[in-house]
Amino acid sequence: ANWGVAPHVSEGIEVDFSRFESYRVEHEADWQEKWGAALGPNDLILVATAQVLKDHPDLNAGFIDGAICRYNEVNLGVAIDIDAGLVVPVVRNADKLSIGEIARTVRELAVKARENRLTPDEMEGATFSVSNLGGLGIDWFTPVLNPPQCGILGIGRIQRVPRYSGNEIVARDLATLVLTFDHRLIDG
């Protein structure tokens, strides 16, 4: 987004995925059997993002013709890297889907994207986007707004790193999440 049109700010935070990673490994076969897809950190982040957007409607909004438009639906754009470049299909009503339904939907959209079979309807109407570059080995990045959306979440790779817990050093699975948002909606 043009900075002069949409002044944007990015803020990052380190998130501990250790408990999730343990849960994921323990229940991987169950998820595969029930949903046809292994559960990944991206699925958890998409579910959490959808719920947070319901609680913070200023981020589930857009600027249309110079006016703020707060959306009633939470439709997540999910960035997918294909040979031809980046596409951002939409998971509709993500706030009403279970983690398994989101996992299955994203995987179906990814297959369609890689086979160049996404329909225009599957590419339009996102109210907020999520971009995960962790699979490419990226630790953190500044995601770019997709106007008229007012927010996008960037996800870096999960790394096992040493951290203090009291007087002990323990291994933790950490990733950096970066939120880029339009400053006109948040403290602007």
Residue positions per predicted region:
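C-terminal catalytic/motor cores of large multi-domain enzyme assemblies
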Residues: 1-188
